[in-house]
Amino acid sequence: MTLFHLILVAAIQGLTEFLPVSSSGHLVLLPALTGQPDQGLAIDVAVHVGSLLAVILYFWSDVRIAATGSLRLARGKVDTQGAFLALCLIIATIPVMIAGLIIKLTGLDEMMRSVAVIGWTMLGFGLVLYWADRTGASTRTASGWTLKDAFLMGLAQILSLIPGTSRSGITITAARRLGYEREGAAKLAMLMSIPTIIASGAVLGADVIGEADWQMARDGALAAALAFVSALLALALMMRLLKSVSFTPYVVYRVILGLILLVYAYS
């Protein structure tokens, strides 16, 4: 794997992981459209680790509260803000973990990795995000997250297993329709990403254990560092822009890219 390809993969993963434009969709498109070889599972794991560290750092205060609360939750107590947040995150993660396992065991994940699928999901779910963002009530904040909403957002997150959907995009869409204001919707989507990335990274990591060598470790470390920096910058920029800008720019990007991909796929 060339240095340029490595930098490109890490930058794409970092910049698109938390924006509602689908990182997995872009990574699938990279080899399909450029002729570059697939980056491999080891690099996938590395860029996931970099993205994970970025979101943990950005939302460290919330992560610390949830981590502390999880200790009380483990003792069967949901009597603190942290314990309740930890419970919500668990409930939000269970649906996608079950669905992801089923898809992996049945081989559906490989069947969905096509330019046409990504084109349709980019376009379709981009329009759904626009609808939800325009019609959402914006009367609720992230601090008002409920177990019911966590479960509903978790169900929506299942759709992110289809390349091109965008995990953050579909969970933000669900949150906006549930009445959460834009910053709150994005924050909840980002917090939900932490256990999801950990779970998917663990699954990918299990497939590469024992295959690592010095070159793979070096490439992985560089990819993780680059993904961390680009993800942190993208996350900070999005959260800042959401104070005054809607999700429409991301929708426009998704629609344009989706149409281009559909023309490419069917021509």
Swiss-Prot record:
Q: What exactly does this protein do?
A: Catalyzes the dephosphorylation of undecaprenyl diphosphate (UPP). Confers resistance to bacitracin.
Tell me which UniProt keywords the record has, alphabetically: Antibiotic resistance, Cell inner membrane, Cell membrane, Cell shape, Cell wall biogenesis/degradation, Hydrolase, Membrane, Peptidoglycan synthesis, Transmembrane, Transmembrane helix
Topology within the bilayer: Multi-pass membrane protein
- Which Pfam families has this protein been placed in? BacA (PF02673)
Describe the family membership recorded for this protein in Swiss-Prot or TrEMBL: Belongs to the UppP family.
Q: Which InterPro entries match?
A: UppP
> Where is it chiefly localized?
membrane
What does the further note read?
Answer: Bacitracin is thought to be involved in the inhibition of peptidoglycan synthesis by sequestering undecaprenyl diphosphate, thereby reducing the pool of lipid carrier available.
Instruction: Name a biological process GO annotation.
Output: cell wall organization
Keyword Transmembrane helix in record: yes
Q: Which residues cross the membrane?
A: 1-21, 40-60, 83-103, 111-131, 144-164, 189-209, 219-239, 245-265
Reaction it catalyzes: di-trans,octa-cis-undecaprenyl diphosphate + H2O = di-trans,octa-cis-undecaprenyl phosphate + phosphate + H(+)
Cellular component GO terms held in the UniProt record: plasma membrane
Its Enzyme Commission number(s) read: 3.6.1.27
Protein name, entry field: Undecaprenyl-diphosphatase
Instruction: Enumerate the PANTHER family for this protein.
Output: UNDECAPRENYL-DIPHOSPHATASE
Per UniProt, what is one GO molecular function of this protein? undecaprenyl-diphosphatase activity
Q: Tell me the compartments it is located in.
A: Cell inner membrane
